[in-house]
Amino acid sequence: MIMKRNILLIISIMMVSMSCEKIWEADLREKALDTIRGYYEIESGVWNGNEPIDLDGDGIASFDYYKEWLGIPVGVGDHGSSLSNGGGSINIPYSMDGNADWGGPVNISRRVERVNMVTEVIIDGKEARLEFSFPDNPDVEFEHTGYGEFTVSKTVTCTVANGEGASRQITGPVTLKFKRTRYKTE
């Protein structure tokens, strides 16, 4: 009888310790995901090409990519991005001449390319870290820079005004800094 009690006590202690371990891992996972999940907007963007560019057609070329992009008078309104437990999507801005296909006048507009990200939580002992991948866009470089902040570097192709109603395509690297605007629960 005493032996059965001891065995039951040992089994009970083992069950409690196993359930505590799972709760502890869940807490680590949640804390890691809290650093990244949410709704984001672009805070700044830098053109990393050899020469400054003029996306908005004002005649002033700049390396301030995001300011140039915002200066384009037409195009998408919502350029926010959203990250959650398993990943999310990040909108990368670029410019495009919508009339180039049919030979119409230059009409450069703002566009975004949505890139999908996968987030994985790696638990190693008492530490948790996040790993990020972009299965459809292997050229994306992602850096988690702080709580609710990250940068993305990607090569983009943009249309730039070339003066007198002409345009040309330019391809180069851009680095964008994103900042969380609102926390997202899931």
Regions found by a protein language model. Name each.
Residues I7-S12:
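Sec-dependent signal peptide hydrophobic core
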Residues K4-R5, V16-S44, F178-E186:
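Bacterial Sec-dependent N-terminal signal peptides
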Residues E41-N50, E120, D124, T151-N162:
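Generic short beta-strand segments
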Residues N48, G71-T151, K179:
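Contiguous, well-ordered beta-strand patches that form the walls/edges
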Residues A61-F63, K67, P73-V76, F178-K184:
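Mature soluble binding/inhibitory domains
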Residues G148-E186:
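Edge beta-strand at a domain terminus
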Residues I53-S62:
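Acidic, glycine-anchored loop motifs typical of Ca2+
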